[in-house]
Amino acid sequence: MAKQHGKHPDTALAQNRKARHDYAVEETYEAGIALTGTEIKSVRDRRVNLKDGFVQVRNGEAWMQNVHISPFKEGNRYNVDPLRSRKLLLHKKEISKLGAATMTKGVTIIPLKMYLKHGFAKVLIGVAHGKREYDKRQDIKKREQQRQIDRVMKHY
């Protein structure tokens, strides 16, 4: 058995901070991404924007759309379109679950976080449905109440 070294946390390269505010995430999946050489260099430089991204299931494959990976500075002719569709690497069972989930009205799949794991770029995707304004207000109210409880408990 191989010797285990200390566990390193996944290095988050990009996060979709608005996602948990605008959507209620029900389930998450970890997916690999098929990237070109210059794209992975840009990802390592943290030049990624997940804000407008979403995932589509087409012909038994999962594709990530609208995720902006900036062109690599020294990439010249090897750079590709920053907003191109990128294939996600998932098991067939996971893809079929995602496909079934998107058939439900109001459910979407969004990228939550991009990180490196053992040298490979991974994306944490979430099956989510959009929050309404009153849902957001309830979340803010709960957070404020928790802060007040923490403040009071800090003194005792």
Swiss-Prot record:
Location(s) in or outside the cell: Cytoplasm
Pfam families per the UniProt record, alphabetical: SmpB
GO biological process annotation, one example: trans-translation
Keyword vocabulary terms for this entry: Cytoplasm, RNA-binding
Main location: cytoplasm
GO molecular function: RNA binding
Domain of life: Bacteria
Gene Ontology cellular component annotations, sorted alphabetically: cytosol
Transmembrane segments: none
SUPFAM superfamilies: Small protein B (SmpB)
Function: Required for rescue of stalled ribosomes mediated by trans-translation. Binds to transfer-messenger RNA (tmRNA), required for stable association of tmRNA with ribosomes. tmRNA and SmpB together mimic tRNA shape, replacing the anticodon stem-loop with SmpB. tmRNA is encoded by the ssrA gene; the 2 termini fold to resemble tRNA(Ala) and it encodes a 'tag peptide', a short internal open reading frame. During trans-translation Ala-aminoacylated tmRNA acts like a tRNA, entering the A-site of stalled ribosomes, displacing the stalled mRNA.
Protein family: Belongs to the SmpB family.
Protein name per the record: SsrA-binding protein
Top-level taxonomy: Bacteria, Bacillati, Bacillota, Bacilli, Lactobacillales
Gene label: smpB
